[in-house]
Amino acid sequence: RQAARVCSTRFQPENWNIDPIQRRNNCYNYATNIQTNTFAQPGRASGRRYRENVGGEVYSACLRDGLTGLRAPDAGTECLIALVVWPGEDYHFYRLDNNGYWSHKSGRTEARNTDDSGDPIIDPRTADRGPYSDFVGWLGVGPRARVN
């Protein structure tokens, strides 16, 4: 498990797994812990979404939304999230919770703290992510982050 630092979200699926919140918020909302009920898309808050569903495009769109780019899984005082992509198809985010494990919410499904094999997520780089084969990188979520 990774040590969660100053900003750590608690895994509280009851805040996300109720309608209409569950069906109107996706993995980007969940990872950033910002409920918009708009099914947020990277770059939409900044007015410039990603053009293609490839790692660099989605990552850059997140930076435009005010997230912090990180080279290592250490967000300091910000909340730590991870971006993965299913090349050409979809993106997905995971977030580090205050218990040192990771959790996520796929699209309109329930928030959960297990991977596609049903195992606790210790590290999103090595978890069973299904078709999301490309680990793109780490991002920090701080007060500048805006999603929509």
Curated annotation (Swiss-Prot):
Residues 105-128 are annotated as: Disordered. Keywords: Secreted. Its main location: secreted. Signal peptide: none annotated. GO terms for cellular component: extracellular region. It comes from the Eukaryota. It is found in: Secreted. Disulfide bonds: none annotated. Component of the acid-insoluble organic matrix of the calcified shell. This is Insoluble matrix shell protein 1. It comes from Ruditapes philippinarum (Japanese carpet shell).
